[in-house]
Design a protein with these regions (language model features):
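Signature of extracytoplasmic/envelope-associated structural regions
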Residues: 1-172
């Protein structure tokens, strides 16, 4: 009971599907192997392929992205208390400072094109997660960008970002 997610990481690459890894913490966990009565179980057939996703910076779709990843860390704090009944259980599981970050990998045709997208201004990033699902990160800034000094045919670079938040994950 009282399950909250501690960390979640969502990523996608060319020729792949969206992948997610989540860590949950709970106030009380009961371990069992029995299935819930009345529930139905089936393999999930709705994997979201890379070509069903998108990344937008503000209102502009970024068509030079080859890989993307975002992380949400709630940094949960486990708070036990001394008590006689159920002393092994946590009393509280509050959220602490939420950390929002991620990384985009780009393939640019020119340094000018890279400079336009990687300008040092605050922005919103929207990640399409298939269908009408999306994750929107507000008040983002580029955190770490390394642009090669020599220009080849294509300019490949990774751009890390951090967001102040909030983040909205919707399916509307």
């Amino acid at each position: 009971t009282g399950m909250k997610f501690h960390k979640v990481s969502v990523s996608c690459s060319i020729e792949d599907v969206i992948r997610a890894v989540a860590e949950f913490q709970g106030l009380d966990v009961t371990i069992g192997t029995a299935k819930i009565s009345g529930a139905t179980y089936a393999d999930h057939s709705g994997a979201v392929a890379f070509n069903e996703t998108y990344v937008k910076k503000d209102t502009t779709t970024l068509d030079r992205v080859t890989d993307w990843k975002f992380d949400i860390e709630n940094n949960l704090r486990r708070v036990p208390v001394i008590r006689s009944s159920n002393g092994h259980l946590l009393k509280y599981l509050p959220f602490r400072h939420r950390a929002l970050s991620g990384e985009l990998t780009f393939e640019f045709e020119s340094k000018t094109e890279a400079d336009e997208i990687l300008a040092d201004t605050e922005f919103t990033l929207e990640f399409g997660l298939g269908g009408t699902c999306k994750a929107v990160f507000n008040y983002c800034k580029w955190d770490n960008i390394s642009i090669p000094s020599r220009m080849e045919e294509l300019l490949s670079l990774k751009a890390a970002f951090v967001a102040k938040g909030p983040v909205a994950i919707t399916a509307s």
